[in-house]
Amino acid sequence: MKVSRIFLVIFLSGIFWLVIAQFFFCTRFQYKQEASAFQGNIIYNPYANINAANWEKCNFHAHGNAWNGLTNGSGSAADIHRVYDSLNYSVHCVSNYHQIDTVDAAQQNYVSAYEHGFNLMKTHQLVLGGRDVEWLEYLFPQTSNNKQDILNYLSLDTNSLVILNHPALRNGYSDKELSSLTNFNCMEVLSPYGISEKQWDIVLSAGKPVFVVGNDDMHDIYNKEQVGRMATILNLKNTNQASVLSALKKGEGYGIVLGKTQDPFQLPELMHLLVKENKLDLQLSEKARSIDFIGQNGKLLASFSDRKNVQYKLNTSDCYARAKITFENGTQIYLNPVFFTNTTNFAQVQNPINFTETIIFKVIGTLLYAAWLLWAWSFINGGRSSKSNRYEIPTFPDSTFPEFN
């Protein structure tokens, strides 16, 4: 009986520790009450220095068999690389959960990758270029402080890059959090689990230079329906890891969703996007059914039909303008934003630690866990039910009390 109590207490103590660690021991932060839109005297154009001959197709999010089959993924890393090579992908990563695959580490186009997160609400991040896996995780539905704490830890390696994965899935990040959280470089706007266009505009409207990524998020390499559906197109002189991460951080690329009849070997491309005296000049390799310019708070700024070349004048009130391009066969291109700024140093402003709240919550958490351990010790030892501690009711002889007639 006592053994079973011990095992029960150990199990419950572990669960309670996870709760205390997540909701009381996690660092707490101060967040801006109002987001700041893009503004400044400079117009940043991520496509200012591109060469239309240097577009390379990339996929950074793919799962294979890992952790002895415990996670969702079929096929080996070698299978994944072989299939993406056959589809003319210049860069393709294996991003298993909390595991950096090194099968192709000797290749010139190898980029280290892993997906961080195994929590209930699918609040996941993709880490590219990291040398070690960050194991800090919060299992239960996460608070804003939990999410910021994880992003801070993932960003400690300044040579790596952090991407918010499928934010539209299960509301992994709320609208308010997208406005306030920092320390991520890109967003997986294009995913088979949802197009996070609204979420991207929330981030951009908060004045954060976060750039688009499109990925297959493939879990079964043998299923043709999961491969080659979405991609990131980067402008690269070479395909080594440093060049790939640099292009992603500068926004020198775009996301693409392939239509059902799209030839994967003949994709439409951006030829140029020039900015002169606030006027944007966009040229495509082929005619598009529609070209939409979208700005602050997701506002439609302008729309064009059946064109391959369009111009749009960027106003300061627009804050930013990004183009969404749709072709006749359903293929879509999502360009990165052109925006007003005062600097091209895109280091994000950190959310400062709220030291007072952090200390108070850690003290409360410590007291709660200490109280739990005291109760657990009492429970294991049977509480007050043992004979040695039982209160005995005294008895008195009959002569003690007078008789009443």
Description of each model-found segment:
Residues 68, 104, 191, 197, ...:
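Residue-level detector of solvent-exposed, low-hydrophobicity positions
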Residues 1-51, 221-405:
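C-terminal functional module detector
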Residues 181-187, 207-211, 230-231:
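Glycine-enriched alpha-helix->loop->beta-strand junction motifs that scaffold or abut catalytic
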Residues 22-167, 172-174, 180-182, 188-203, ...:
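A metal-dependent hydrolase metal-coordination microenvironment
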Residues 105-109, 158-159, 208, 287-289, ...:
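Short glycine/proline-enriched coil/turn segments at helix->beta-strand junctions
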